[in-house]
From Swiss-Prot:
Subcellular location: Cell membrane
Record-given protein name: NADH-quinone oxidoreductase subunit K
Catalytic activity: a quinone + NADH + 5 H(+)(in) = a quinol + NAD(+) + 4 H(+)(out)
Catalytic activity, EC: 7.1.1.-
Organism: Bacillus cereus (strain AH187)
Gene of this entry: nuoK
GO-annotated cellular components: NADH dehydrogenase complex; plasma membrane
Membrane topology per record: Multi-pass membrane protein
Amino acid sequence: MSSVPASAYLTLAIILFCIGLFGALTKRNTVIVLVCIELMLNAVNLNLVAFSKLGLFPNVTGQIFSLFTMAVAAAEAAVGLAILIALYRNRTTVHVDEMDTLKG
């Protein structure tokens, strides 16, 4: 059984991170921006797992840290969606351009 080289994992992680970064910087829908940020976090998790599995000293530290990162990402998504729902109820829009003013 052949093993997948580390460069394939790292290339995939770079591609995922770049797609997420491009989406987070160019899209105007807040839900899409949150999804793109989650995609970037998943690319980082892929790097953590790849380096912990295929590094010079393989151990499970990167995999455990990746699990903690997924838990934090789930909490971040829940809080982000709750804030988005509250903003939508007040402004009736989910576009980033229209959420830049503060009420005083």
